[in-house]
């Protein structure tokens, strides 16, 4: 049951995982935009050997984007994924940001890239940027999951907060409804002529749930569009985001830690991770880092 209680939505502490790649400056530029929009504390994380020249390079970019004196740089050696996860825990991050390729080779996807490994293990929310940009590029379109899940209330609230912070005018809330599957599971309870009515009842329940969630949020001038799409959850919302040229897709974080089997036999979230349609935000209700 949804409580209707307002949760703390602001990403107060954001970690940016950076590496010496062609995307370095673009990731720092994106961090600067986030700091302006969300008023967050920014922590840059680099795993690798430390040299004066490398420190100078990063500091020059931080200064260029007015982040040198109001951000923190953590530089550690170790295995990349585990080191970043440990820093997330130590710093009690609300959001981790990393660059990610839209699509990877099958072998690399199954074995796991750094960004995708982090997304499956991190306790906080995670933003995967497919095309970080140096130049200012307005956020125009957000697609957010509206599934029947205890996390969805918080996820939609976060989507609305981000839309307000970056002056996004349109937010699409997508109900991925596998109605045939839902009816099949309970088909023994209904006669053949009752199946259609049961589908209607399921749709009505979903509409009431989403309307309740939206009524608990101050949407301001944002236009909320609710669409119901019947199909495989995870896959169908990614397809929708791509076809509608969304700038940001926002999903609930996985309900459990994902493993190799989930990549070979994809779960809902793995459909999105396999072929990112745009920037992807996985919203997690922040866990106790001491657990």
Report residues per predicted region:
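Structural beta-alpha unit
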Residues: 1-9, 33, 50, 60-96, ...
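Gly/Ser-rich helix-loop-strand patches that form or flank binding pockets
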Residues: 1-2, 85-135, 240-291
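Small/aliphatic-rich secondary-structure junction motif
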Residues: 2-57, 64, 69, 141-193, ...
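Structured loop/turn residues at secondary-structure junctions
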Residues: 19, 50, 76, 102, ...
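A conditional alpha-helix N-cap/helix-loop micro-motif detector
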Residues: 24, 77-78, 108, 152, ...
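General small-molecule cofactor/ligand-binding pocket signal
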Residues: 43-45, 72-76, 127, 172-174, ...
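N-terminal membrane-insertion helices
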Residues: 54-62, 203-211
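A short acidic, glycine-rich active-site loop
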Residues: 193-205
């Amino acid at each position: 049951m949804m409580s209707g209680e307002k949760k703390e939505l602001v990403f107060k502490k954001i970690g940016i995982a950076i590496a010496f790649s062609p995307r370095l400056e673009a990731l720092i530029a994106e961090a600067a935009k986030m700091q302006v929009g969300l008023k967050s504390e920014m922590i840059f994380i680099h795993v690798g050997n430390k040299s004066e020249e490398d420190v100078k390079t990063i500091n020059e970019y931080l200064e260029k984007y007015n982040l040198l004196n109001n951000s923190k740089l953590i530089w550690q050696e170790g295995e990349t994924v585990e080191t970043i996860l440990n820093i997330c825990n130590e710093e009690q991050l609300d959001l981790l940001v990393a660059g990610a390729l839209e699509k990877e080779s099958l072998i690399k996807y199954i074995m796991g890239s750094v960004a995708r490994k982090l997304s499956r293990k991190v306790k906080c929310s995670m933003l995967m940027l497919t095309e970080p940009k140096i130049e200012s590029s307005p956020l125009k379109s957000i697609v957010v999951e509206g599934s029947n899940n205890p996390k969805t209330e918080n996820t939609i609230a976060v989507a609305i907060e981000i839309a307000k912070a970056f002056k996004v005018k349109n937010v699409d809330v997508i109900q991925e409804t596998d109605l045939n599957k839902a009816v099949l599971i309970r088909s023994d309870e209904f006669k053949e002529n009752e199946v259609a009515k049961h589908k209607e009842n399921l749709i009505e329940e979903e509409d009431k749930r989403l309307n309740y969630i939206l009524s608990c949020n101050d949407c301001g001038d944002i236009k909320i569009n609710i669409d119901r799409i019947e199909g495989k959850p995870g896959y169908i919302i990614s397809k929708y985001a791509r076809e509608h040229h969304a700038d940001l897709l926002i999903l609930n974080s996985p309900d459990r830690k994902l493993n190799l089997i989930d990549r070979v036999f994809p779960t809902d979230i793995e459909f999105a991770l396999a072929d990112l349609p745009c920037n992807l935000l996985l919203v997690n209700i922040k866990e106790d880092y001491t657990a």
